[in-house]
A protein has these predicted regions:
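NAD(P)+-binding Rossmann beta1-loop-alpha1 motif at the extreme N-terminus of oxidoreductases
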Residues: 2-72, 94, 298
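Hydrophobic beta-strand scaffold residues
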Residues: 37, 57, 121-122, 163, ...
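Rossmann-fold NAD(P) dinucleotide-binding segment
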Residues: 61-117
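Rossmann-fold dinucleotide-binding core
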Residues: 101-184
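Helical "substrate-binding/catalytic lid" subdomain
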Residues: 171-294
Length: 310
């Protein structure tokens, strides 16, 4: 999806921490949208290509300390603490927008620390991956001060199709945890029914074509159909990252006394993948595990299947 020219913003300076698969694609859209953006990544070479879109790639985190809005998109809570600690060592931004998948407790600790420094804080985790971002279909769920959200919203709109404000505090973290628990349960079930259909004699592409045209079809099932049909498991989200999010969900379930038997079973299946050494593949390789458990071998069907993004 092309960037809406009406969304271009230049009123605020933007700092960006993290240029992994997700962070790079998000920062790229901001740069292409005309934002005054400076980017830091632990491995600078991964961020350097952003310069051709107008971003300034910096060597030190401290160079981002006085930006109006500082976005963070890294892997873990420990990473968030480390990079923010260095970024705020010699100054402070007006606002931090934290987009990583972290726990409620970690997010609350960050909020307390930043509020103590007079910095506004938004929890703004996302739904999507790098390909979804490039298609302009990333979505955010956001919690924190409503006034801060209104300031950040134009930048969120540049990166995707929009954002949902769910209230104060860490409510966005709960929403993202619930989202990713559902992601794990749905991909496992999608693999189960796809293998069931195949073992009964149906081509995977035929079954998924029907499913995606039915009321059960969704952006996610359509997006994953090419991988399940043609066994093209380029990495969008690893089993280890999904295990982390399922663990966060199960921890939240214990905290709020909510039984989560499906999430627990799915977590065990993800752990089984990791135990096999399938740690860096895409999480959709659950299909291969399901096929092995069902006594069948899979071959690519080599059928042109659309992913629903274009």
């Amino acid at each position: 999806m092309p960037i809406d020219k009406k969304l271009k913003v230049k009123n605020s300076t933007v700092g960006w921490i993290g240029a992994g698969r997700m962070g790079y694609a998000m920062a790229e859209r901001l740069a292409k949208g005309g934002c005054d953006i400076a980017v830091w990544n632990r491995t600078k070479a991964k961020a350097d290509p952003l310069a051709k879109y107008g971003a300034k790639v910096v060597n030190q985190l401290e160079e981002l300390s006085t930006k109006d809005i500082l976005f963070v998109m890294v892997s873990t809570y420990d990473d968030v603490k480390e990079v923010l600690g260095k970024a705020l060592a010699k100054g402070k931004p007006k606002m931090v927008v934290e987009c990583s998948s972290i726990s409620l407790e970690g997010s609350a600790e960050l909020r307390k620390m930043l509020q103590g420094k007079g910095v506004e804080y938004l929890a703004a985790p996302v739904s999507g991956n790098a390909k979804v971002i490039k298609a302009g279909k990333l979505t955010f769920v956001v919690s924190g001060p409503k006034s801060a959200y209104e300031t950040a919203k134009p930048y969120l709109d540049i990166m995707g199709t929009g954002s949902s404000y769910v209230g104060e505090g860490e409510l966005a973290r709960i929403a993202k945890i619930c989202h990713n628990v559902m992601l794990g349960v749905v991909i496992q079930n999608l693999c189960e029914v796809t293998i069931l259909a195949q073992k009964a004699g149906m081509p995977r592409h035929a079954f998924l074509d029907f499913l995606n045209k039915s009321v059960m079809g969704s952006m996610f099932t359509r997006y994953k159909a090419p991988a399940l049909v043609n066994l093209d498991f380029h990495v969008t989200f690893t089993p280890k990252l999904l295990r982390k999010d399922l663990d966060l969900g199960l921890d939240a379930g214990r905290r709020f006394e909510v039984p989560m038997p499906l999430a627990s079973a799915t977590r065990d299946l993800i752990q089984s993948m990791i135990g096999r050494g399938w740690t860096e593949q895409d999480f959709a390789t659950l299909l291969l595990q399901q096929a092995q458990a069902s006594g069948i071998e899979l071959e690519p069907e080599n059928v042109d299947v659309k992913d629903g993004l274009s």
